[in-house]
């Protein structure tokens, strides 16, 4: 029983420390499209180098997208967030 509790704590801390793609809007509907270079767009929560690589949200009036640094990660990641949110 003790080992199960330790395993659950380890998994919880791992998700908290490393983050999860859902933190970047992965649950918000987005368009998975092919880019002009033939590659697929990058999903929210995954590494990118510029905004043009990221998948766009289906509802562009409510949501915006981009490629930026997350507080918990050193690299840039794609994100989708609500335009009215102060966290965007």
Swiss-Prot record:
The keyword Disulfide bond applies. It is found in: Secreted. It comes from the Eukaryota. Residues 1-19 form the signal peptide. The keyword Signal applies. Its main location: secreted. Probable neurotoxin with ion channel impairing activity. This is Toxin ICK-12.
């Amino acid at each position: 029983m003790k080992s199960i509790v330790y395993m659950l704590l380890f998994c919880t801390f791992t998700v908290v420390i490393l983050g999860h793609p859902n933190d970047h809007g992965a649950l918000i509907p987005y368009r998975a499209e092919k880019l002009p270079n033939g590659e697929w767009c990058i999903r929210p929560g995954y590494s990118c180098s510029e905004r043009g690589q990221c998948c766009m949200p289906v509802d562009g009036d409510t949501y915006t997208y981009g490629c930026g640094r997350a507080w918990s990660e050193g690299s840039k990641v794609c994100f989708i967030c609500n335009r009215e949110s102060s966290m965007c």
